Amino acid sequence: MATNQTDSSTDRLTHPLLEKLAPLPAAAPHLFAYSAKIVCGRQGETGCCCAAGVRPGVYATEVNIQNLNLVTAPVLKFVLPLINSGAVVAREPDVADPATLRGHQTDVVKLPPLAATMDDCCRVAEMVLGAVPSGDAPLTIAILTIVSAFELSVSVVYTANPPGGDGISIDVEYLQPRLLGLRGQG
């Protein structure tokens, strides 16, 4: 006699970190994911860490997230540090693995309809270190990953100053979402 069996893995999200977004609408076939490069802090003239082509200067990044939906959007954010306060922590063959994140490196925020929030260098430092450092922070390079069941508007503002303070560079990028398949899909 045949029975109606259910495989519990079909109900489980494909990565344990995504469980923080649960419960998701049953009909949701995928999640929207955004990957923002973060460059923060001071890179000195005598580079501390062979910083992969980062020139001397002061760097800042701000990530803006807006929920352009008419429902509240749960948003999962996590930081994958590559260079942490001047120390290279994820140069190949080493990797920044989301499965090994500490609690303060992840955050879930519920964005009301049409609401916005931002993550800047202070917030990224708090997520990576557990607290905001005082004074000038050494170079930190990381990936801020943003995941939601709803499509969001995500922009990133990068600023850089040379060591002498002569001039400033500002760049704004708008991030397109990547689709993450749920429950074994894509």
Predicted regions and their residues:
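Gly/Pro-rich, tryptophan- and cysteine-flecked surface segments typical
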Residues: A2-G186
